[in-house]
UniProtKB/Swiss-Prot annotation:
It is found in: Plastid, Chloroplast thylakoid membrane. Binds multiple chlorophylls. PSII binds additional chlorophylls, carotenoids and specific lipids. It holds the Pfam family PSII. The chain crosses the membrane at residues 21-36, 101-115, 140-156, 203-218, 237-252, 457-472. Coiled coil: none annotated. This is Photosystem II CP47 reaction center protein. GO terms for biological process: photosynthetic electron transport in photosystem II. Belongs to the PsbB/PsbC family. PsbB subfamily. PSII is composed of 1 copy each of membrane proteins PsbA, PsbB, PsbC, PsbD, PsbE, PsbF, PsbH, PsbI, PsbJ, PsbK, PsbL, PsbM, PsbT, PsbX, PsbY, PsbZ, Psb30/Ycf12, at least 3 peripheral proteins of the oxygen-evolving complex and a large number of cofactors. It forms dimeric complexes. One of its GO terms (cellular component) is photosystem II. NCBIfam families: PS_II_CP47. InterPro entries: PS_antenna-like (IPR000932), PS_II_antenna-like_sf (IPR036001), PSII_PsbB (IPR017486). HAMAP family: PSII_PsbB_CP47 (MF_01495).
Length: 508
């Protein structure tokens, strides 16, 4: 046929049977990728430490999405929260992966069948005897069916009426588990961090989809609208479908990057804004202050801080710290976290408590500056020692650890104090194993960052695709060179060739 690569899809333009076939094959590829990727991730995933080596540190991409929807058990006998199980049931991680692969195979066979048997009676217009599709009717059918699926997900799966519920956690990502969720019908349902909004919005959107689908099945579009929007042209369907996809991609890029109830930090890692705003640091200090108010010692108060909470307050878990072309998981960057060393408290020789100024997200290096409670600089690690006034040696800074592995240990040796001051720039201090994976010490992004980058990039690409195909279908007669002053009404789009003698003509 000699078509250039960018025009090969024209072969299914007027061939409804094979148009269906290639879409079924596309579904087979998507489902097959999802199932295969899940099996690969399960082969390399280490479930032994859900606190310091969770799925997002290991670079898992599809496991978090399965977990979000209620899958927590493995046929390997482990649970995502760290426990062991004896009866994982059919819908384990492996069960879902297998179901996708089986479904992919069935779609593959169906695609071949529809490619071979393309000339079906159902695609034949009985008035003309030519293949055609009633696109407004198909739109109504798809809208109705997607509405049913959307309503069913919100009303049954999410609420636990028939299904497991979804992953729900506290604001600090400590107590997450799969549980049923009641729909939130009040104004709180519009809070992106309220899980009940997921149920209520799916129920509402599904109901709207069902009603809209029934409307489009029972009401034909007016002739002027049908012709104006080129509703008889399959490229109109392509254009509007691309619009729906790029809009959804932009939305989920936002909910992933900025965080929401649909992207829990236990499954995808914290957001960069939680580091920027000192979100976890504030909660840690609040808990310590509450402990001190209950007459606990400083050591006791810090020892009660969950290791999981302390680990979130570490810059290496910030998805914006990874470079754009740094492949690999977070564990391949700064290493596998082994344990929390504790919270370092720095003091000068007068006994004044000092705080290390933390590194902002987009810095690779940052000066080590220690300030007092009023924000006044009291110590630093100088760049030029000859001019220094606030060096650790001159000010006599010491460090003492509370909580963690070094609880109660103090250091006054300047070299050691400076070492921990540098590490305190990065948040809470953890022991990291860089040997096991030959980690290079350069920060990587989490799946939150990859998902956002991928979906934002493809959304932009698909936006241009929508403009391109929308323009082609709306201005097809202009591009084809039809004279706008033509005094014959040409039903353009029903036939592919200009000058086709069978094209109906009607005097204007």
């Amino acid at each position: 046929m000699g078509l250039p690569w960018y025009r090969v899809h024209t072969v299914v333009l007027n061939d409804p049977g094979r148009l269906l076939s290639v879409h079924i094959m596309h579904t087979a590829l998507v489902s097959g990728w999802a199932g295969s990727m899940a099996l690969y991730e399960l082969a390399v995933f280490d479930p032994s430490d859900p606190v310091l080596d969770p799925m997002w540190r290991q670079g898992m991409f599809v496991i978090p999405f399965m977990t979000r929807l209620g899958i927590t058990n493995s046929w390997g006998g482990w649970n995502i929260t760290g426990g062991t199980i004896t009866n994982p049931g059919l819908w384990s991680y492996e069960g879902v992966a297998a179901a996708h692969i089986v479904f992919s195979g069935l779609c593959f066979l169906a695609a071949i069948w529809h490619w071979v048997y393309w000339d079906l009676e159902i695609f034949c217009d009985e008035r003309t005897g030519k293949p055609s599709l009633d696109l407004p009717k198909i739109f109504g059918i798809h809208l109705f069916l997607s509405g049913v699926a959307c309503f069913g997900f919100g009303a049954f799966h999410v609420t636990g009426l028939y299904g497991p519920g979804i992953w729900v956690s506290d604001p600090y990502g400590l107590t997450g588990k799969v549980q049923p969720v009641n729909p939130a019908w009040g104004v709180e349902g519009f809070d992106p961090f309220v899980p009940g909004g997921i149920a209520s919005h799916h129920i509402a959107a599904g109901t709207l989809g069902i009603l809209a689908g029934l409307f489009h099945l029972s009401v034909r579009p007016p002739q002027r609208l049908y012709k104006g929007l080129r509703m008889g042209n399959i490229e109109t369907v392509l254009s509007s479908s691309i619009a729906a996809v790029f809009f959804a991609a932009f939305v989920v890029a936002g909910t992933m990057w900025y965080g929401s109830a649909t992207t829990p930090i236990e499954l995808f890692g914290p957001t960069r804004y939680q580091w920027d705003q000192g979100y976890f640091q504030q909660e840690i200090y609040r808990r310590v202050s509450a402990g001190l108010a209950e007459n606990q010692s400083v050591s006791e108060a810090w020892s009660k801080i969950p290791e999981k909470l302390a680990f979130y307050d570490y810059i290496g878990n910030n998805p914006a710290k990874g470079g754009l072309f740094r492949a690999g998981s977070m564990d391949n960057g700064d290493g596998i976290a082994v344990g929390w060393l504790g919270h370092p408290v720095f003091r000068n020789k007068e006994g004044r408590e000092l705080f290390v100024r933390r590194m902002p997200t987009f810095f690779e290096t940052f000066p080590v500056v220690l300030v007092d409670g009023d924000g006044i600089v009291r110590a630093d690690v100088p760049f030029r020692r000859a001019e220094s006034k606030y060096s650790v040696e001159q000010v006599g800074v010491t460090v003492e650890f509370y909580g963690g592995e070094l609880n109660g240990v103090s250091y006054s040796d300047p070299a050691t104090v400076k070492k921990y001051a540098r590490r305190a720039q990065l948040g809470e201090i953890f022991e990291l194993d860089r040997a096991t994976l030959k980690s290079d010490g350069v920060f990587r992004s989490s799946p939150r960052g990859w998902f956002t980058f991928g979906h934002a990039s493809f959304a932009l690409l698909f936006f241009f695709g929508h403009i391109w195909h929308g323009s082609r279908t709306l201005f097809r007669d202009v591009f084809a060179g039809i004279d706008p002053d033509l005094d014959a009404q040409v039903e353009f789009g029903a036939f592919q060739k200009l000058g086709d003698p069978t094209t109906k003509r009607q005097a204007v």
